[in-house]
Amino acid sequence: MVGGVQIAELWRYPVKSLQGERLDAVAVTADGLEGDRQFAIYDVESGLGLTGRRVPELLFASARMRADGTAEITLPDGSMAGDDNTLSDWLGRSVALRSAATEAARRYENVVDFEHESTSDWKPFDGAARAFHDNPGARVSLVSTATIGSWDPRRFRANVLLDGEGEDSLVGSRVTLGEATLAVGLRIERCVMTTRAQAGGIERDLDVLRTIARERDACLAVGALVIDQGTIRVGDTLGAS
């Protein structure tokens, strides 16, 4: 894939499973894009982190990072969620917004059978330490325009959208983007989140995950660890390290 492929879009998601913000440039830290997955909403009773898998309503709120490192959350009705009570009222359960600096367990749930979700079991899994990534090997996620085709890139919540094709071939290699160097280590296995309805007119579509399972071994996008930190920008060219 390396050779002339550029960054088409950059995205970060300050609060896990909420809509994120599109950026022109961003610093890359050891934990991924600065401000990415720095907060998560937790169910107080169960102690589990909530995601759009179990609570699809999350995908209709949005978050952006403030200059002071806090997250500004906008609820589906356009109002701001200033505290845990507001979030709890919205979701109809007692919840708490927690930051990546806390010692909260990184435990979430995924549905076992997305085709029969209403009767399926749910399986707990442990995510990465520090920033609230699902996979410790995917601090930065990359996907190409060719791979997603006509699908909205927001379904896959990747950080870097590359204008090209063939990101799977990067697995096992080191690449440069702007000032950053990444070690691409894995293909990202997809889940029911990709089928969810979202803000902005994205409709529920089980065929998305069916297609990924059938044609791509259930994987779409690649995950990377950060070797060298630095700033990346839209238009930066992917290079070999």
Q: Model regions: which residues?
A:
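Metal-cofactor-dependent catalytic cores
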Residues: M1-S241
